[in-house]
Amino acid sequence: YVAWTLCAAQALAIKVVNPGGINAFKYNQRKLDLDEANAAYGVTPRQILLSLSAAVSELGLPHPLHIHGCNLGVPGNLATTLDTIRALDGLRVHLTHIQFHSYGTEGDHKFSSGAAQIAEAVNAQPDISLDVGQVMFGQTVTESGDTMRQFAGSAYADPKKWVGMDIECDAGCGVVPFRYKNRNFVNALQWAIGLELFLLVDDPWRIFLTTDHPNGAPFTSYPHLIRL
């Protein structure tokens, strides 16, 4: 099935977005953790990730499975990300916009950096690569196939409008305008977490400079980010 999909779509690689979560959202689940079963099909994100990463390996694709994991942007998703890394030990995978998956729940605001723990786990597993998804301050728009998380993020839309839709009853899409503010505690910490990850991952060939355009910032902000 994976090989047929690649051929039919004339694609170069496989990416999975919130594995199982987009479908679960259609059955009124508003979250789906790594070992939480989809209410309709009884499949967990862990099973999906292991099956897809094995298929990519067996097909000999040059690019590893591209993973947008569970619980993007959720305080405490650090634990989910670490569990995901451990589950995929020995398999070639690429973790996307890892900054958005590196949040703890410490402190008065119940929001903290998990960058050190993520970097430690990545440094210990040479088969994993990642891109940062750096946040830059200013106006942008978030665009994602992760309807579940875009629905949750719509409460913070700036300006107050958003769109979510079902793509051919088979996938998801959400677009939410957003403004990152340097005087906002959460936004400022997101900015710092991204920079921490750049500095803490030992192998520069396994960590890539991105803003997850346009979700963390438009790519036109790259010169400023590089200067940082």
Model feature map: region roles:
Residues 41, 179, 183, 211-218:
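Generic alpha-helical structural element
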Residues 168-192:
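Aromatic-anchored helix/helix-loop segment that forms the rim or "lid"
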Residues 1-166, 176, 212:
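Metal-coordinating catalytic core of metallo-dependent amide/deamination hydrolases
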Residues 190-228:
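His/Asp/Glu-enriched, well-ordered alpha-helical/loop segment
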Residues 52-55, 117-119, 183, 194-198, ...:
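Generic recognition of flexible, low-complexity loop/linker segments
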Residues 44-45, 75-77, 184-194:
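A general structural motif
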Residues 61, 94, 169-175, 202-207, ...:
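Short acidic (Asp/Glu) and glycine-rich catalytic loops that position anionic groups and cofactors
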